[in-house]
UniProtKB/Swiss-Prot annotation:
InterPro entries: Exonuc_VII_L, Exonuc_VII_lsu_C, OB-fold_nuc-bd_dom. Keywords: Cytoplasm, Exonuclease, Hydrolase, Nuclease. Belongs to the XseA family. Heterooligomer composed of large and small subunits. Its EC number is 3.1.11.6. GO terms for biological process: DNA catabolic process. Coiled coil: none annotated. GO terms for molecular function: exodeoxyribonuclease VII activity; nucleic acid binding. Its main location: cytoplasm. This is Exodeoxyribonuclease 7 large subunit. It holds the Pfam family tRNA_anti_2. The gene is xseA.
Length: 555
């Protein structure tokens, strides 16, 4: 006979089936026809979806808050997104929906997704292109229908929240074949005239067909080209259009756009008060810190130096500290002088070498130029001698004058450069001397502060030493008294437990005559045996004549 599995409770089996369905069918899409549609006052929708052969129960929780613009009815062809689960009390599996699309809208949704992906790939929805909204706009542009409730809601919110504002309304058609073109033209006109600081594109809720104008590519491109920040307030919170993705900010509703575009006067006042409180607190904290620091410095400056004869260890400490200070100062001065000499010698040497090189280059260039001019003059002179024409003589004189002027100008430039270098060298030498004097003053000041701090530290250490010494003596006295009392108590206990003191009160001690051990029980005695008895003032030998054992006896 085959071994059967243990029986399961119905609840356990139902839970297992429920977990299996929910884990394997967590996201499904079902297409069919609605039947038995029931919308409860709580906002939950219960329905059945069927085709020609099968039927499936379903539920859509909080349906009314998400799809209040259209109520489904029996016979509607829909596409439902959801998951499978089990309703345990009846043991029925059902679909729990989280999105419902009417079958006629499926093609539009597919077109919406395709256009969205293409425009996103082209960079129209890039986060880097988003413009920040002005904190306090002076003029607000609204592109919407002038006759709808949307513009009234926006104006009501603005009048309640904003202190001073201007609204420029550009009337357009928000539904139909011409709506997309009118809206894009309105955006272009607003950007061309530069009359507003921020734009709001608004429309009330509706089906996907009603809102399709805001999914047109022409509007997305107009928003992308806009230099004015744009807020998209199209439809309800659950409605999404391509206009929302392209805009700089998306508002869930037109009323929310009125709250986003203009910060309320009370909020501005609260922010200002918050900043003012922060500045006051920060200033108070800063002043308190500076006052505390000044008081601390004042205590240091007002400290009266005094010296009392310290112990020998404190003298050694002072000598050691002074020696350490002198050594440190000496080493610092020596290193400073060494660095200064190194800097001075190195820089002066490099400057000297540089000037010498420049002077050599100048002389060499001058000599080369002069030699070249001499050769040129000799050549010209030969030509003059050979040809003996007045034309060469007339050309030679201006060239000679020009050459002399150029040489004089070049020589003057080099002399000015040399003078400038010498001035820089003197300035640098002066700076080094000033720095040396400044560092020497700082070292002397540091030495004075260290001496003053040393005196203060020595006095403070001496007071701490005396205080610790006094505490040590007090602690030792307390410890001695405590051990003395403990010794007295233990001595009294030893005296009270001494057997000899017990014998003084009339008691006696028995010892075995042969083994010389104490007898504590009558069972260890025998008739005619000998025992020794010890009294207060002596011992005696006794013979046992009779032995009686007692079971228990209380005194």
């Amino acid at each position: 006979m085959a071994t059967s599995s243990p029986p399961q409770a119905v609840t356990t089996l139902t839970e297992s089936i429920k977990n299996l369905l929910e884990s394997n069918f967590c996201h499904i899409v079902v297409k069919g026809e609605l039947s038995n549609v029931s919308l409860q006052p709580s906002g939950h929708l219960y329905f059945g979806i069927k085709d020609s052969k099968s039927f499936l129960n379903g539920a859509f929780f909080h349906f009314k808050s998400k799809y209040f613009d259209r109520r489904p009815k029996d016979g509607d062809s829909v596409i439902i997104h959801g998951k499978l689960t089990v309703y345990a009390p009846r043991g029925q599996y059902q679909i729990v929906a989280h999105a419902l699309v009417y079958a006629g809208e499926g093609d539009l949704l597919q077109k919406f997704e395709e256009t969205k992906k293409r425009l996103a790939a082209e960079g129209y929805f890039s986060i880097e292109k988003k413009q920040p909204l002005p904190r306090i706009p002076k003029c607000i542009g609204v592109i919407t229908s002038p006759t709808g409730a949307v513009i009234q809601d926006i104006l009501r919110i603005l009048s309640r929240r904003c202190y001073q504002y201007k609204v420029l309304i550009y009337p357009v058609t928000v539904q139909g074949a011409t709506a997309a073109k009118e809206i894009s033209q309105a955006i272009e006109v607003m950007n061309r005239d530069k009359l507003v600081d921020v734009l709001v594109i608004a429309r009330g809720g509706g089906s996907i067909e009603d809102l399709w104008a805001f999914n047109e590519e022409i509007i997305v491109k107009a928003i992308d080209a806009s230099t004015i920040p744009i807020i998209s307030a199209v439809g309800h919170e659950t409605d999404y259009t391509l206009c929302d993705f392209a805009a700089d900010v998306r508002a869930p509703t037109p009323s929310a756009a009125g709250e986003i575009v203009c910060q309320s006067s009370q909020e501005q006042i609260q922010i200002f008060k918050s900043h003012l409180r922060y500045l006051n607190a920060h200033a108070q904290q800063l002043l308190a810190g500076k006052a505390k620091q000044i008081q601390q410095w004042k205590r240091y400056l007002d400290h009266v130096d005094f010296f009392r004869p310290p112990h020998q260890s404190l003298d050694y400490l002072r000598v050691s500290i002074e020696r350490s200070i002198q050594t440190t100062l000496s080493q610092s001065k020596q290193r400073y002088r060494q660095y200064t000499r190194w800097l001075q010698s190195d820089i002066l040497q490099r400057m000297t070498y540089r000037l010498q090189d420049l002077w050599k280059m100048i002389n060499l260039a001058f000599q080369n130029r002069l030699l070249a001019l001499k050769h040129h003059c000799v050549h010209i002179k030969k030509n003059l001698v050979i040809h003996n024409t007045q034309q060469y003589r007339q050309r030679f004189d201006p060239c000679r004058d020009q050459i002399h002027r150029a040489l004089s100008q070049r020589l003057g430039y080099f002399q000015q450069s040399l003078a400038h270098k010498q001035t820089l060298l003197k300035h640098f030498t002066t700076k080094i001397n000033q720095l040396f004097i400044k560092e020497t003053s700082a070292l002397n000041l540091l030495k004075k502060r260290l001496n003053k701090a040393f005196v203060y530290t020595v006095c403070e250490r001496r007071e701490h030493f005396l205080y610790a010494k006094e505490n040590l003596f007090l602690s030792l006295n307390h410890l001695v008294e405590r051990h003395r009392a403990k010794y007295h108590t233990v001595s009294q206990q030893l005296i009270s437990l001494n057997p000899k003191n017990v014998l003084k009160r009339g008691y006696a001690m028995l010892f075995d005559f042969n083994e010389n051990s104490a007898i504590i029980s009558a069972k260890s005695l025998h008739k005619h045996s000998c025992v020794r008895v010890r009294l207060q003032d002596g011992e005696a030998t006794l013979t046992v004549t009779d032995v009686q054992n007692f079971e228990t006896q209380e005194f």
